[in-house]
Each structure stands twice: as structure tokens, then as C-alpha cells.
């Protein structure tokens, strides 16, 4: 196990470029940090161990030793992890870059074997080739990769990943790209490598190669908001900001293939980029569809539908002395925009329900209450219109000119009054609402702070370093809600 880690340790003194590229945290003397009990492959040292969350992308893909280096596969610095990273589509040319890099960094020839023989201190006969002391020579070249699927963007991180484990909680899946390259051609590459090995090690090398290179690919899995850590979220004025660290290179390459061409033919440029790179910290907003869905689900879980039957004059989030309507504690760590939306939505539904139903106290048990929760849970799904129509039909609508309408005459506060006028684009509010008007008002209240169609599905910490730098220069990393404000707010 951990053949790739051992190879990085022993091969790091071979050449100058190896000394810079093969320094990984798993071979350092640093004290390990606390793990998060997620077992998987560290994509930097390739060992199967307990993982922690990366400081660059907030995903669990790095071990408790390598996390000290603060390296991420999304960095622009050409360290070893970056050199093993390619974006889809994967072509034969890109796979050839991976093979050439392995052959350059981890060569197997007579000089290398003799060098390791001199360094090995065996308890038994020095001429005995034991896998315990020569594990670094048993590193075959395979085309297995850990694959991250960020919606339509797919990122491959190639490495020699040994062992098996359940992948249910991992943000990536293992894929074998041998058929994209050529199965027989890759076999030939490895047969040439193992031909220089002593016969005792050749069998072990072949066993490792065929075991890993013939593994089937897993089905890709989307990365979800639940895969990201909340440890690097900070709350300022009840808005959340995510801290991310990236290693930024002063030298840029347009494509991954250009980077590998310099690795093969212009090593000085790679060394310059490694020594001049700097770590940069970004504060990025955490407004994304995944987080909004999570907040909406939590809001639906904690909401008190009894408020729509009450006579409370306070906003729904401010009621504290009522056992049926008190939800104040749920907003302690929630975005203030969610609280504002909750207050307006509950106030509007209360006004509609009190205008059409004969209820007078929040202790009343009404059949409409579960549907109010569904409004929050379905607010970001395609079922929202169907849910709102069901809610509308539970408010005792009447038929006028073959159209269902409900009365709308209960008191509302001034801010909600102005907001509804803006949504309906009218000078005076109607005293009767049709189903499409009811739906438009509710969806307008829900979408008042951000347009769901324009919000990214995942946090922007998964964007490339070049994209983060461009957004930083344009001021688009700010947590201010104006950056994601909906189009309807500009119509007033």
C-alpha cells in the first residue's frame, strides 16, 4: 500500500525538478491534524486513509498530513497535484502527458536500482530484494483517476490509487481511462519499465499493475452542497462568507498540454513558477443554489404555519411569547435575507387565509398547515406552481366568470404592500386574486433577493484559480446581496 507515497519519498532526491515536485505532506514530520472520519484516497499522496477538508475547495480529498501543504488540484501553481489534473474532455494526447510525466519523475533503470540498493539498510542479506524496502520501484503507470463532477465541468486527477473502500461520502469517483488510451500500448509501457527490475520484483510489479489497471470505472456522481465543509464559513452581519486559499503562479499556461510540454522541455520555467508562486486568500460569498435549497428545507422544517391563523401584528420571525408561532431561535445563524423573505411570505399567506377562512386564533388546527411547509420545500423545484395552486384551492376560492378567485382584504404592512404592487405592476392592489396572481406574488417574494435561474448550483470556491482572480479584480467575490439581486428589484 501507499506505493505512490513511497515513490515520492525515495525519488525526490534524483533530480532538481524531483526535489521541488515530489515534496508531499505525507512524507513530512508534521503532526497530523484531526481527521473528519471520512475514509478515502488522498488525491495528493494517493494513500487510502481518513480525509480532511481542503482549504482550497472545501471538499474532503486530502489526508491529515498533506493538508498542511495547503495544495489543491484547482491551484495555478504547477505542483505535482496540479500536473496530475486535467479537465474534460480526456484525450489520448492528455493521457500521453500523464505517462511521460511518470516516466520522467519515477524512472526505472539500472542506475536507479543500484542507487536504491546502496541506500537500503536491510536486516537480512543486502542482496535480497524485498518489497518492504523496494516498494518505490513497484509503481506501475496506470490511468486511473479521481473524477470530480461540478455540474457540466468534469475534472480528472490521475494517480495510483490502491485499495478499496466505500465511496458513499466521497466527493469524487474512480474512473479508469485505459480504453481511451490503448490497453495493449499501456501494457507495453509497463513491460518496458519492469524489464529492468530483478525477477523477484517483476512479479510483484505485474501483480500491482494488472490489479489496478483492469478496475472498472465507477458511475460519476455530482458534487453537492452537502459535500462542502462549513468549517471555513464565517458569519458577518448575518451573511456567510467562505474562506479559500489558493497557490497562485505568476506564470500561466493556456492549456494543460502546454504545461506538460514545458515540464518535458523547459524545466527551468516550471522551477521558476514553483519558487515564485504565492499563497493567496480569497473571501468569497456563499450564495449558491445548493445553500439556498438547504436553508429553504431548514426553514420549512422550523416554520410555524399556525401564524397564518393568528392575529399577531409582529413579523412572523419576531413572535416570541406564543407557543404556536415562536420561531425566533431558528434565525440566530440564518441569513437576514431568509428572515425577510419568511416574514413577507407568511404575512401574505396570513392575509389571504384570514380574508377567506373563518379562523381567529393560532391554536386552531387547520388542514392547510402542511401545504405551507410544502411551499418552502418546493420553492426551488419545478413543483412550486402545483403546490401554490393546491394552497390557493384550500383558501375557499369562488368562481367568478369561470375563474377561481380569493378575497384579499386583510391588513398588510407597508413594505409588503409596495412589494406586491411592484410584482403585479399595478398602482392599486386588487381586492380579489386569481390563481396566477397568487402564484406570481409568492414566487416574487421568494425570488426577491436572488434570481434562482442565475445563481450557480455550487459555491464559487470550486472555480479555477484564474477565474477567482478575474472575479476578484472585477469585485464579484463580494458577499453583498446586490451582486445576485433579481431583475424584478430593478423595475421599481
UniProtKB/Swiss-Prot annotation:
Entry's Gene Ontology cellular component terms: host cell cytoplasm; host cytoskeleton
Region named Zinc-binding domain: 42-79
InterPro entries according to UniProt: Rotavirus_NSP1
Region (Important for cytoskeleton localization): 82-176
Region (RNA-binding): 1-81
Motif extent (pLxIS motif): 483-486
Region (Interaction with host IRF3): 318-492
Keywords: Host cytoplasm, Host cytoskeleton, Host-virus interaction, Inhibition of host innate immune response by virus, Inhibition of host IRF3 by virus, Inhibition of host IRF7 by virus, Inhibition of host RLR pathway by virus, Interferon antiviral system evasion, Metal-binding, RNA-binding, Viral immunoevasion
A Pfam short name: Rota_NS53
GO annotation terms (biological process): symbiont-mediated suppression of host cytoplasmic pattern recognition receptor signaling pathway via inhibition of IRF3 activity; symbiont-mediated suppression of host cytoplasmic pattern recognition receptor signaling pathway via inhibition of IRF7 activity
Cellular location(s): Host cytoplasm, Host cytoskeleton
Primary location: host cell
Disulphide connectivity of cysteines: none
Entry's family note: Belongs to the rotavirus NSP1 family.
The name this protein goes by in its record: Non-structural protein 1
Source organism of this protein record: Rotavirus A (isolate RVA/Equine/United Kingdom/L338/1988/G13P12[18])
Amino acid at each position: 500500500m501507499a506505493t505512490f507515497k513511497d515513490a515520492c519519498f525515495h525519488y525526490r532526491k534524483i533530480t532538481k525538478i524531483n526535489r521541488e515536485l515530489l515534496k508531499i505532506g505525507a512524507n513530512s514530520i508534521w503532526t497530523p491534524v484531526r481527521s473528519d472520519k471520512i475514509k478515502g484516497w488522498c488525491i495528493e499522496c494517493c494513500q487510502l486513509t481518513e480525509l480532511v477538508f481542503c482549504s482550497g475547495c472545501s471538499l474532503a480529498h486530502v489526508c491529515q498530513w498533506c493538508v498542511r501543504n495547503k495544495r489543491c488540484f484547482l491551484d495555478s501553481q504547477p505542483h505535482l497535484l496540479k500536473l496530475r489534473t486535467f479537465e474534460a474532455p480526456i484525450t489520448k494526447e492528455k493521457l500521453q502527458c500523464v505517462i511521460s510525466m511518470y516516466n520522467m519523475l519515477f524512472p526505472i533503470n539500472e542506475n536507479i536500482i543500484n542507487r536504491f540498493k546502496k541506500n537500503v539498510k536491510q536486516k537480512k542479506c543486502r542482496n535480497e530484494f524485498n518489497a518492504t524496502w523496494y516498494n518505490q520501484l513497484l509503481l506501475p503507470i496506470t490511468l486511473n483517476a479521481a473524477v470530480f463532477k461540478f455540474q457540466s465541468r468534469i475534472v480528472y486527477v490521475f494517480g495510483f490509487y490502491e485499495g478499496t473502500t466505500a465511496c458513499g461520502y466521497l466527493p469524487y469517483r474512480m474512473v479508469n481511462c485505459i480504453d481511451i488510451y490503448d490497453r495493449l500500448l499501456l501494457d507495453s509501457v509497463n513491460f518496458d519499465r519492469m524489464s529492468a527490475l530483478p525477477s523477484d520484483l517483476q512479479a510483484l510489479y505485474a501483480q500491482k499493475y494488472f490489479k489496478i489497471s483492469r478496475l472498472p470505472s465507477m458511475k460519476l456522481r455530482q458534487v453537492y452542497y452537502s459535500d462542502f465543509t462549513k468549517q471555513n464559513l464565517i458569519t458577518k452581519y448575518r451573511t456567510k462568507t467562505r474562506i479559500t486559499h489558493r497557490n497562485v503562479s505568476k506564470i500561466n499556461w493556456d492549456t494543460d498540454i502546454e504545461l506538460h510540454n514545458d515540464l518535458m522541455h523547459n524545466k527551468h520555467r516550471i522551477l521558476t513558477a514553483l519558487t515564485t508562486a504565492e499563497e493567496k486568500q480569497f473571501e468569497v460569498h456563499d450564495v449558491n443554489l445548493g445553500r439556498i435549497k438547504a436553508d429553504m428545507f431548514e426553514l420549512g422544517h422550523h416554520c410555524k404555519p399556525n401564524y397564518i391563523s393568528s392575529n399577531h401584528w409582529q413579523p412572523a420571525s419576531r413572535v416570541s411569547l406564543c407557543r404556536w408561532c415562536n420561531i425566533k431561535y431558528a434565525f440566530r445563524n440564518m441569513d437576514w435575507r431568509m428572515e425577510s423573505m419568511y416574514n413577507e411570505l407568511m404575512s401574505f399567506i396570513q392575509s389571504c387565509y384570514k380574508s377567506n377562512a373563518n379562523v381567529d386564533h393560532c391554536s386552531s388546527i387547520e388542514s392547510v398547515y402542511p401545504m405551507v411547509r410544502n411551499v418552502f420545500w418546493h420553492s426551488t423545484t419545478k413543483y412550486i406552481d402545483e403546490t401554490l395552486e393546491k394552497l390557493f384551492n384550500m383558501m375557499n376560492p369562488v368562481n367568478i366568470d369561470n375563474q377561481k378567485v380569493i378575497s384579499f382584504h386583510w391588513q398588510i404592512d407597508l413594505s409588503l404592500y409596495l412589494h406586491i404592487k411592484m410584482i403585479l405592476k399595478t398602482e392599486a392592489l386588487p381586492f380579489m386574486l386569481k390563481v396566477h396572481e397568487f402564484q406570481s406574488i409568492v414566487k416574487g417574494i421568494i425570488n426577491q433577493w436572488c434570481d434562482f435561474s442565475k445563481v450557480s448550483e455550487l459555491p464559487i470556491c470550486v472555480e479555477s484559480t484564474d477565474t477567482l482572480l478575474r472575479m476578484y479584480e472585477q469585485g464579484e467575490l463580494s458577499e453583498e446581496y446586490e451582486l445576485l439581486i433579481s431583475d424584478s428589484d430593478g423595475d421599481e
